[in-house]
């Protein structure tokens, strides 16, 4: 399929590294790209602020993408966060639970996000739902697995009589390869934007800017982001091969 053959996409956009790369990926391929974010009672408001910063800087630094960047939607689903509590929505330690999952796992989060995104996409006339889910460097979250997303895609299409596609460009990439994809899509300018503006840290830390971005440097999200950056940097900062 040639670039930008399909017309519109809706990116599930948190303002983190992965969804920021997915936004750039979609902007390279679609004529119109809208974004959707979810207020589900996250402990740190910085996540919602980062979304706007990334969108603003993408439009400012990449004029070729600015004309394709469409409307942003923010959906209030805090009632879901109150039910599906985790270390991301409540003041809890980040640790492994008895189920073998990190306490940062929000049960059903991606399933809920995709349901809301599909309902929005239906209204907006969009078939492609783009998300940053990944099996390679993920934290064991079952709703990041491709088989989960395939089942969700089938359920949405059956239940809404549509032909949605859940696209996951990072699914089989390591974090180092995700940095390489950033370089491929937008050069060092996009890498710098993601370092400076995106937010990953579970602790909401924005005070210190490391080579790989803002963050506490000790939570699992920061450690994974730093590890990927260091591996990519030491390997020569190459763009991901197409």
Swiss-Prot record:
Main function: Catalyzes the ATP-dependent conversion of 7-carboxy-7-deazaguanine (CDG) to 7-cyano-7-deazaguanine (preQ(0)).
Ligand binding (ATP): 13-23
A molecular function (GO) term: ligase activity, forming carbon-nitrogen bonds
Pathway involvement of the protein, from the record: Purine metabolism; 7-cyano-7-deazaguanine biosynthesis
Record-listed Zn(2+) binding positions: 201, 216, 219, 222
InterPro entries for this protein: QueC, Rossmann-like_a/b/a_fold
Lineage: Bacteria, Pseudomonadati, Pseudomonadota, Alphaproteobacteria, Caulobacterales
The protein, known as: 7-cyano-7-deazaguanine synthase
KW DNA damage (keyword) present: no
EC number, as in UniProt: 6.3.4.20
HAMAP family membership: QueC (MF_01633)
Cofactor(s), by name: Zn(2+)
Reaction catalyzed: 7-carboxy-7-deazaguanine + NH4(+) + ATP = 7-cyano-7-deazaguanine + ADP + phosphate + H2O + H(+)
Classification via CDD domains: QueC-like
Gene behind this protein: queC
Annotated Pfam families: QueC (PF06508)
Cofactor note: Binds 1 zinc ion per subunit.
Gene Ontology BP terms: queuosine biosynthetic process
Keywords associated with the record: ATP-binding, Ligase, Metal-binding, Nucleotide-binding, Queuosine biosynthesis, Zinc
Family the entry assigns: Belongs to the QueC family.
């Amino acid at each position: 399929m040639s670039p930008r053959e399909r017309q519109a996409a809706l990116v599930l956009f948190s303002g983190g590294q992965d969804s920021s790369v997915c936004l750039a990926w979609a902007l390279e391929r679609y004529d119109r790209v809208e974004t959707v974010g979810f207020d589900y009672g996250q402990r740190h408001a910085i996540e919602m602020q980062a979304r706007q910063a990334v969108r603003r800087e993408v439009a400012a630094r990449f004029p070729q993408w600015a004309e394709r960047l469409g409307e942003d939607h923010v959906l209030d689903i805090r009632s879901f966060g109150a039910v599906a509590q985790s270390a991301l929505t409540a003041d809890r330690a980040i640790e492994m639970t008895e189920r073998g999952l990190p306490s940062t796992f929000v049960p059903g989060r991606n399933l809920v996000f995709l349901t809301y995104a599909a309902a929005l996409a239906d209204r907006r006339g969009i078939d492609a739902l783009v998300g940053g889910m990944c099996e390679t460097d993920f934290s064991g979250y079952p709703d990041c697995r491709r088989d989960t997303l395939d089942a969700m895609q089938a359920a949405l299409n059956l239940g809404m009589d549509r032909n949605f596609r859940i696209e996951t460009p990072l699914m089989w990439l390591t974090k180092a390869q995700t940095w390489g994809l950033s370089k491929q899509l937008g050069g060092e300018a996009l890498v710098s934007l993601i370092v400076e503006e995106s937010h990953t840290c579970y602790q909401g830390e924005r005070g210190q800017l490391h080579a790989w971005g803002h963050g506490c440097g000790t939570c699992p999200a920061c450690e994974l982001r730093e590890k990927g950056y260091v591996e990519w940097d030491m390997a020569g900062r190459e763009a991901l091969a197409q």
